[in-house]
Amino acid sequence: MPKYDAVVIGAGNGGLAAACRMALAGKKTLLVERHNLPGGCASSFRRGRFEFETALHELCEWGTPENSGNCRNTVVEEYGVPLKGCIVPENFRVITTASDGKTHIDAVLPCGVEAFTDRMEELVPGCRKSIEDFFAIGKECLDAGNYSLSVNGKTDSKYMMEHFPNFLKVGSYSVNKVFKALKMPALAQDIMNTYWGYLAIDADRLSYLQYSNMVNLYVRHGAWIPDKTSHELTTGMLERFRAMGGDAWFDCTAEQILFDDNKAVCGVQTNRGVIETKHVLCNGNPSMVYATMVPPEVIPERMIKLANARKHCARMFVVYLGLDKSAEELGLTDYSIFMQDSADSVKEYNSGKTLETNNNMVSVCYNAVNKNFSPPGTCVLSLTTLYMEDAWADVKEEDYVATKNRIARRMIDKFEKTLGVEITPYIEEIEVATPWTMCRFVNTPQGSAYGYELDDWDSMMARMRMMGTENQVKGLKFVGAASIRGDGYNSAIFSGSTMAKLTLADMKKEEEG
């Protein structure tokens, strides 16, 4: 029976980050993955002469060597993963109707705090002070988060009150409540709320801290994409893990997590046999793991209640298009465009609960930033929408293909109508992924690759402050989208690194007796 200091289940962003952190610390670590490639959602696939990015729109918290974000620091500087990529020059373009139901919005917002603020003032005269206050508070919140990390969450209350008073003031409020407190004009709020779909919860409930952190990181560091899709990122982490002495088994399914008489982890049962270990870092959804991989008697009642109280987050539907015209020929100059019927996030969230009413969409043209993303004279375009409920559960198997093709056609039509650009005649390759696809490939409940909703009671701040109670099964910790910081590549990587550090701390305590 092979024995390891730690076993990491699942080679998604969180699992790979955890595996690298453990190997970097010199621990004998095994990574097991049921597929034949790493990445989970962070991957790519080929159709014809096109290679499609599976999930990444743009990576947050990355930046450049001169303006590096924490995610880049972890992956490149600490883990030593050599990566080349492109900075996305604008944060986003948004095309929608304002929450007043009348005003048309079509705006491009640049990177950089000063440029972003100037552009907002051009779009909404008189909003400058509220935007400046937003970024000032955002900087304070980022600094507070970095301080918390530097002391492993053991913050000093007096120090927090002296140095981060606004962080404490806004910590328990939603995005919309803080925007109103900042006296931000309604139209400015509509534009500033554009990114809500990246966290998939409406701004009435979305934690201001979570949203502020994300927007500030995008604006301050810029968004980034790897040259060769997410597959380059995840295979790069895998190669570094192996170079640091780690073992990786692919086509290997973890079937059960094993426990001793003290209800502590003692091993993992796989389709290749049993692996002995005292520590498991699981890149999976706790609801699925508790239901299928862990004996019920070892799970504390609180963890069952917590998993049941949480709501599965957005379920992805993506149309992948390989076009036989270049982005320049088609006039596709914007990298990322948010196309919403309304800037009212509550209305859009509720519309996203059914197949028929969901009309929210984000387009990404990778060639607008990376000219070599596809063969010369071509471009790759993705259209993504999110379902806020398990709407696909009611689709009959015999209706599946027709349903997904009908929705894909509706999304293509919306793109063409909104931008006044015809793409249908130039579609060389098309693939459609539904929540069922996500269920199959990454084994997430309802196809929810975003983990659990970051609701007001279950926000990033709440999870971070309660880290000690999030992992009550001895020897088992969760990483990835369903972990402490929610969805997003950077958040998954952060969770993997953080949970690995906590595991290393547990190991040290065990060694010290």
Per-range role (PLM):
Residues 56, 481-503:
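A conserved FAD-binding loop/helix module that cradles the flavin
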Residues 326-436:
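C-terminal segments that line or cap access tunnels to active or ligand-binding sites in enzymes
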Residues 185, 189-202, 358-364, 421-485:
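A glycine-rich dinucleotide-binding beta-alpha-beta segment and adjacent secondary-structure elements
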Residues 2-140:
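N-terminal glycine-rich phosphate/pyrophosphate-binding loop and immediately adjacent elements
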Residues 255-375, 470:
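Mid-domain catalytic core of redox enzymes
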Residues 99-206:
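Rossmann-like flavin
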Residues 259, 505-513:
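Active-site-proximal substrate-binding core of FAD-dependent oxidoreductases
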Residues 212-265, 271:
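Helical element adjacent to the flavin cofactor pocket in flavoenzyme catalytic cores
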